[in-house]
């Protein structure tokens, strides 16, 4: 049985930990509000960009003049996985679930005889994936500590991806991130970004058979050559915003659970402490009474 001193030290330690987890929960809640607003405000722009591109590309997909960012290289041999996680832990399964999705995808591709290359954004994804895919990791970036992600940072990542694609380093690129739904729901997501995965629209479905005659100046090809790289940056930026909100939501939930568990542990240890102290007092009283009777 632990001594009273051990129990007091244990209770003090748990109380100190509870203060830390409570503070982290409050910080995550404050950051979540900003991150959630940014993610929700970014979704319509990213979705509208994809919709505009889908309408423009309706007659070009699969055609000879289609940009390579839209039609791809025509091959499916080398895959680039862009895995976006966080730099910090204590966020529940946020980081591990994204890394697990990317790992399973990589294993499936390698089992099919494909070549896999990995680019990580965030320290935690790098820490997990390099255990198994050290030779496949070709680039890694941190999220810059506690600074909120911004468009220039997303542009750096997108420019690197685009440069590697134009250099012929891969055929298909897939982006891995966590889509924010709510504080308790973040969905690990895989999105193909090269060739661009565009939504099906009425214009794209009708294509050349549409009765509406539309002329573009400049041509669709020229517009797409300009917009597709922008769309790549927008999709990366959206993924980073979704990740930021998901990370804070997961951390807030995890720290709330840790705080409540610490409270339960304090109650349990305090009860044990009181029972142990009562037993010791009772034992001492019995010894005193027994000694008095012996006299």
Swiss-Prot record:
Transmembrane segments: none
Protein's recorded name: ATP synthase gamma chain
Localisation per UniProt entry: Cell inner membrane
A Pfam family the protein falls into: ATP-synt
Keyword Cytoplasm belongs to the record: no
Gene (UniProt): atpG
Keyword RNA-binding assigned: no
SUPFAM superfamilies the record matches: ATP synthase (F1-ATPase), gamma subunit
Keyword list, A-Z: ATP synthesis, Cell inner membrane, Cell membrane, CF(1), Hydrogen ion transport, Ion transport, Membrane, Transport
Main localization, broad class: membrane
GO biological process, one term: proton motive force-driven plasma membrane ATP synthesis
GO molecular function per UniProt: ATP binding; proton-transporting ATP synthase activity, rotational mechanism
Gene3D superfamilies for the chain: 3.40.1380.10, ATP synthase, gamma subunit, helix hairpin domain
Function: Produces ATP from ADP in the presence of a proton gradient across the membrane. The gamma chain is believed to be important in regulating ATPase activity and the flow of protons through the CF(0) complex.
Its membrane topology: Peripheral membrane protein
Family: Belongs to the ATPase gamma chain family.
């Amino acid at each position: 049985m632990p001594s009273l001193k051990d129990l007091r030290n244990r209770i003090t330690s748990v109380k100190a930990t509870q203060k830390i987890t409570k503070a982290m929960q409050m910080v995550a809640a404050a950051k979540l509000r900003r991150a959630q607003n940014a993610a929700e405000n970014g979704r319509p722009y990213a979705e509208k960009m994809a919709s505009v591109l889908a309408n423009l590309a309706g007659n070009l997909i699969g055609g000879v003049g289609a940009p390579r960012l839209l039609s791809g290289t025509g091959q499916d041999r080398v895959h680039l996985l862009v895995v976006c996680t966080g730099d910090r832990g204590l966020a529940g399964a946020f980081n591990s679930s994204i890394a697990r999705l990317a790992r399973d995808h990589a294993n499936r591709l390698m089992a099919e005889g494909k070549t896999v290359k990995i680019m990580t954004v965030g320290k935690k994804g790098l820490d997990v994936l390099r255990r198994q895919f050290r030779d496949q990791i070709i680039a890694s970036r941190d999220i810059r500590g506690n600074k909120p992600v911004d468009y220039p940072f997303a542009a750096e990542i997108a420019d690197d991806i685009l440069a590697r694609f134009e250099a012929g380093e891969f055929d298909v690129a897939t982006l891995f991130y966590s889509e924010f739904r709510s504080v308790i729901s973040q969905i690990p997501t895989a999105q193909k970004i090269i060739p661009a995965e565009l939504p099906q629209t009425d214009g794209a479905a009708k294509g050349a058979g549409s009765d509406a005659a539309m002329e573009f100046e400049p041509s669709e090809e020229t517009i797409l050559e300009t917009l597709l790289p922008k769309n790549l940056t927008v999709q990366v930026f959206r993924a980073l915003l979704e990740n930021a909100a998901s990370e804070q939501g997961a951390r807030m939930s995890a720290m709330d659970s840790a705080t409540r568990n610490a409270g339960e542990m304090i109650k349990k240890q305090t009860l044990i402490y009181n029972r142990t102290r009562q037993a010791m007092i009772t034992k001492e009283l019995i010894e005193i009474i027994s000694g008095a009777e012996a006299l």
